[in-house]
């Protein structure tokens, strides 16, 4: 592809940017770099968009340091980074929960006379929330934005509402929603975020009230809205009510996308009604919907639930023959499915092959592997993967602490828990109780007293 473009005399900076963007999306960063060099040789100079595209690719698929190195090359080429440059770097660092790096990038922006925009602050707030630093996130909303002369818009509130809901602070989210209503009309996405949060908290009545508010605002519930409510019914084992809602909406003329069918199928799988699940999948095909990666993921989940590994292998072969690209969820299903069916070595081999194929190892897959290996009794193997993880969240640490306790490694669990407190990572009190009671049960009374005192001291220091 690159060689062909070198011979193309009509190459312009705009075309160069389009090609670089395509290569980056397909993770072909080396080819993108070669294309830029070839463009320069042909007299086509890259601009800030070219480098920003490259930086975004490195942030997503390689690493922050590699992405940051591109900014030095930009300046060497006489091109000044802009706010979009730093937003990509900030997003990449925030995705990896590298708060110190995010704050450093903010400082550097200001030093270069580049002012953060709403997107920059939205990303910072999201990072604070993921790390459990809620006060800092609200300080950004009520103080930093005001000092920067920026007015929070719907996107800012959506970020905050989504973070509050995911952290379980539903009442705070509802209060913030009222504040938002006093400033401007919430978007359909806002209602969907709140309905999703309420459904995950299993607050059925409030979710129904929010749906009524959505309709009063002049919006029509979309597939996302109803799929969210369907999932609530299915999670609370109200399978019959969920199926009734699904059929009612179909009769009323609502067009369901594949996701609604997959929600129905997933619920039927979880309740052991695999025959009905197959029938719904066949109905989806009869309606003219070809299998895409989402439907294949649902089928993979179905086959793993049945323990039908032969069908899994056949389906993976079909995906490959059709030239379809498995997504992160596909690989998570495979790793989780293999672990649940006792195929721990195959799960590890697949996990390792993901890295070899250049597939980003997302946090969910890593957590899944570590937790699954621990539960299968392979704690030492799990800990090796845990130590190699670049990004860890509250679930990672909580899972490992509990699994270490189950394996009677209370001292190790205590040290890990203390490191979490020192880093300001919020861990459920159940993990603290498990560690302290385990130390006492194993006769380590001195260790228990020492650990309790250190935990208390650290918690007071972080408050």
UniProtKB/Swiss-Prot annotation:
Disulfide bonds: none annotated. Keywords: Repeat. It comes from the Eukaryota. The keyword Signal does not apply. The keyword Ribosomal protein does not apply. Coiled coil: none annotated. InterPro entries: Pentatricopeptide_rpt, PPR_P_subfamily, TPR-like_helical_dom_sf. Pfam families: PPR, PPR_2. One of its GO terms (molecular function) is mRNA binding. PPR repeats lie at residues 12-46, 47-81, 82-116, 117-152, 153-186, 187-221, 222-256, 257-291, 292-326, 327-361, 362-392, 393-427. Belongs to the PPR family. P subfamily. This is Putative pentatricopeptide repeat-containing protein At4g17915.
């Amino acid at each position: 592809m690159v060689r062909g473009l070198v011979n193309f005399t009509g190459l312009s900076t705009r075309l160069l940017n389009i090609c670089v963007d395509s290569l980056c999306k397909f993770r072909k960063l080396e080819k993108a770099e070669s294309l830029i060099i070839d463009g320069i040789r042909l007299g086509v100079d890259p601009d800030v968009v070219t480098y920003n595209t490259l930086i975004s690719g490195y942030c997503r698929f390689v690493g922050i340091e590699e992405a940051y190195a591109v900014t030095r090359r930009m300046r060497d080429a006489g091109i000044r980074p802009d706010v979009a440059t730093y937003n990509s770097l900030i997003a990449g660092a925030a995705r990896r929960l590298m708060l110190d790096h995010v704050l450093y990038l903010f400082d550097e922006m200001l030093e270069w006379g580049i002012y953060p925009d709403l997107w920059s602050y939205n990303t910072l707030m999201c990072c604070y929330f993921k790390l459990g630093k809620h006060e800092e996130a609200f300080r950004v909303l009520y103080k930093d934005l005001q000092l920067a002369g920026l007015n929070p818009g719907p996107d800012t509130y959506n970020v905050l509402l989504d973070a509050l809901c995911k952290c379980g602070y539903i009442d705070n989210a509802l209060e913030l929603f009222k504040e938002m209503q006093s400033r401007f009309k919430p978007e359909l996405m806002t209602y969907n975020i709140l309905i999703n949060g309420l459904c995950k908290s299993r607050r059925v009545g409030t979710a129904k009230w929010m749906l009524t508010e959505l309709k009063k605002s002049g919006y029509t519930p979309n597939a996302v809205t109803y799929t969210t409510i369907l999932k609530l019914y299915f999670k609370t084992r109200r399978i019959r009510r969920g199926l009734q809602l699904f059929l009612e909406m179909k009769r009323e003329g609502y067009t369901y996308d594949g996701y609604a069918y997959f929600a129905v199928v997933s619920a039927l799988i979880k309740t052991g009604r695999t025959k009905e699940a197959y029938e719904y999948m066949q109905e989806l095909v009869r309606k003219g919907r070809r299998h895409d990666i989402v439907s294949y993921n649902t089928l993979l989940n179905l086959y793993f639930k049945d323990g039908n590994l032969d069908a899994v292998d056949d389906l993976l072969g079909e995906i490959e023959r059709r030239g379809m690209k498995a997504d992160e969820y596909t690989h998570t299903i495979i790793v989780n499915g293999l672990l649940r069916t006792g195929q721990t070595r195959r799960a590890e081999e697949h996990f390792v092959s993901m890295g070899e194929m250049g597939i980003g190892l997302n946090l969910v897959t890593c957590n899944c592997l570590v937790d699954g290996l621990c539960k299968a009794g392979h704690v030492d193997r799990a800990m090796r993967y845990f130590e190699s993880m670049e990004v860890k969240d509250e679930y990672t640490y909580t899972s490992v602490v509990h699994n270490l306790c189950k394996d009677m490694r209370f001292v190790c669990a205590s040290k890990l828990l203390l490191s979490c407190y020192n880093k300001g990572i919020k861990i459920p009190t159940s993990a603290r109780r498990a560690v302290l009671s385990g130390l006492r049960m194993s006769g380590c009374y001195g260790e228990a007293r020492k650990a309790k005192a250190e935990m208390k001291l650290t918690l007071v220091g972080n408050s």
